[in-house]
Amino acid sequence: MTQLLDVREVALRFGGIVALDGVSFDLEEGQILGLIGPNGAGKTTLFNCLSRLYTPNLGDILFEGRSLVDRPPHRIAEIGIARTFQNLALFSRQSVLDNVRIGGHARCRSDFVSDAFHLPWERRQEEALEEAAWTLLDILGLRGVAYDLPEGLPLGTRKRVELARALAAHPKLLLLDEPAGGLNHEEVATLGELIRRIRDEQRVTILLVEHHMNLVMSVSDKVVALDFGRKIAEGTPAEVQQNAAVIEAYLGTGHKAVDTASGRIPAR
């Protein structure tokens, strides 16, 4: 496999608070990596570094062998990185179809002149974007709500809309920030199947932050655990789940294994 992402000794401070402390790991093409940790461990902060919302104080982040740390956030999608957010960021006054089409514009070439005069190549581009959007709506089971506004849809459906919008940018790396948040057991199971399908059928490498242990362990090829901004474990799902440092981080001393009966990692 070819290495796609290489996180090297990334550190970030907010004043006197250490948010990330020398975090390193890599991700190969075609893998699904689960990033776990108690609340405040630094997971979303690391995601924000990967998507260039934050700039590390130290370390480097390489994507396809090139550093990301000097690239502005609006130039991330064009190199093949897309993400979803814990708090959905859909355009509430645009239809589901339009939300997905907007995602496709992230990797399109356009300028003021072509927009103003509707040049032929731009019309062809718009037609291709709409065709791709309909394909994604079919894949994610959203065709029936294509002309609906997101705000009136159930949470699980809105999460699929945001996922479709991210995929419309044709990413090589997809960052999923707590995709199972607020979903019921059946919806989480369906999400797990969907994540695997996206990896296999769309050939997308996936990095997800998630508190739902059963989901992480069922879909991930590799898991990285953080605590207080440091990496405390890395390995297969089974290895990380039984790691003593991970057990201590989640449950404190005196426990033999992480309890996954509820499907969620207990908060510290």
Segments predicted by a language model, with ranges:
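Glycine-rich phosphate-binding loops of nucleotide-dependent enzymes
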Residues: 2-268
